[in-house]
Amino acid sequence: MSRIGKQPIAIPAGVEVKLEGNLLKFKKGNLAKELDTKANVNVEIKDNNILFSPKGEDRQSRAYWGTYRALAYNIVVGLTQGFSKTLEINGVGYKAALKGKVLELSLGFSHPINYDIPEGIEIVVDKNTIAVKGSDKQVVGQVAAQIREFRPPEPYKGKGVKYSDERIIRKAGKTSKK
């Protein structure tokens, strides 16, 4: 029995949810998202709640049950509150600047790195902090991971791009022989 799958999702005010076959359509204002559920998961909209249940008792149906409930919940939260990830840049001369729909990063390379911001993502740069915001949890995490990947934090001095809540395990440097 899926503990996540059996919990109903309350539909907040202002969010429209329609079920067309296996396709769940979410809409709030001008934001619209779709979730294509597999044929082995039942979806019902009852009493302003979205209910999920497995069609069969096979392993795959039970696995998809909790997965699709979590995906639908993330869409509802994304439409109402949004998601954000915060990155910090540490290092001498390391900086970030926003130029239109391009994030320009100076991370100690011989050239600046230009990162094209995907559609539906908002990036706010404040000194050495980059905030990635959007309504799709997967895309926000992916963009933050791609920015971090340009210069991951190194364990000796901690220079690089890291998540704000990430803890870097530091290493001791070399000791001289006597």
Curated annotation (Swiss-Prot):
Entry's Gene Ontology BP terms: cytoplasmic translation
InterPro entries: Ribosomal_uL6-like (IPR000702), Ribosomal_uL6-like_a/b-dom_sf (IPR036789), Ribosomal_uL6_a/b-dom (IPR020040), Ribosomal_uL6_bac-type (IPR019906), Ribosomal_uL6_CS (IPR002358)
Pfam families linked to this entry: Ribosomal_L6
SUPFAM superfamilies found in the cross-reference section: Ribosomal protein L6 (SSF56053)
Entry superkingdom: Bacteria
Gene Ontology CC, one term: cytosolic large ribosomal subunit
The entry's keywords: Ribonucleoprotein, Ribosomal protein, RNA-binding, rRNA-binding
Molecular functions per Gene Ontology: rRNA binding; structural constituent of ribosome
PANTHER family: 60S/50S RIBOSOMAL PROTEIN L6/L9, LARGE RIBOSOMAL SUBUNIT PROTEIN UL6M
HAMAP family, A to Z: Ribosomal_uL6_B
Subunit structure: Part of the 50S ribosomal subunit.
Family indicated by similarity: Belongs to the universal ribosomal protein uL6 family.
Function of the molecule: This protein binds to the 23S rRNA, and is important in its secondary structure. It is located near the subunit interface in the base of the L7/L12 stalk, and near the tRNA binding site of the peptidyltransferase center.
Record's protein name: Large ribosomal subunit protein uL6
Source species: Campylobacter jejuni subsp. jejuni serotype O:2 (strain ATCC 700819 / NCTC 11168)
